[in-house]
Amino acid sequence: MERPIRFIAEAIYENRLKPFTFSAGTNLNWKYMDNQYLGDVVSENGIRSLGIYGFAQIKGSLGQFKEGTSRLTYVAGFGLSNQSYRQGDEEFSFWLCRPKLTLAYSLSSSFQIRLGSELSQHISQIAMISDTRIRKNSMEWTVGNPSLKPNSRYENWVVFSFSKPRINTDFTLNYRINRHCNLAKYTRTEDDQFLYTQANQPHCNMLYLTNDTRFDIIPDHLIFSVNAGIYRFFNKGDEYSHCYTAYNYGGTLQGYWGKWTVMLYADSGWNFMEGENIGHNPPSLATSASYHIGDFDFTLYMHNPFMAHPKSYSAEIVNALLRKQVRGYDNSGGNLLRIGVAWNINRGKEYRKIQRNINNEERETGILK
């Protein structure tokens, strides 16, 4: 039985001055949950949280090329946030100063360098701060930790961009630092039960170098896009230290001939490490062809052809007390063939409405997932 209440409000001010544009704003997010769970899981959660954030920034440009584009653009700002929380006897109030600076300098109309640095706030999933305890199997339990606190995330990046009429490429170097973040923690009891929970621990950092390239083989007819990256993960817990290197890549080939559109997509999946968990999302292969005639679009789509039982996920736990490998397979995801027909019946004049509503949907339940 769920009884969540949530209130969100925000206000933004902007003034376009001559040398730069000044903007400021504030955001308030209040939430109360008093949920009761019965059956296999017995839990009653009374959680109150309040988040307040305010910021001010300036945005401008200096110098111009003959084409009219700016040589140097900048954004400099400062924010202050507070996150307070209470559940039973547990409560905290977390303050964080949040500066931000981004610079973009164009060496020419084709080559640009972008630099950035930002300090932000990261809040652990609400599902992990309940006081619930769930049995996973005969030897494993998942346990909530109401004493989890938010943490700061410090991110620095540099992007090298090159652009020509037929080719666009970006090289991105990024270093993300998560200090005192929530990471996995395993405990072995005297009766050989393994308790999994999360706790604030030293850091979980990521350094990566990626490239995104688009090449128009035949302009407006045949386009090839590719992305590739090297990712290095650094995980430091209270009782462990793990590093992991992953290589992720993918590509898309798109063709346009008259009323025909053809697409071929392939990737290596996403590989990562967080805490003591190594995750592997499997490779994917897809192709589609569509034909447009009048008000109709006919589409043929294939996903993972020639694969009867493709792997949907795999994970590995590398804890000193617990070694575990998990794999999942999806019969419905292999040799998938889908035929689609779309009929456009729009007639008359169309007017676009201005969307002024804040779209927020409450999906948090306060229980472990």
Task: List each language-model region with its residue ranges.
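Exposed, low-structure sequence patches enriched in small/polar residues
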Residues: 2-369
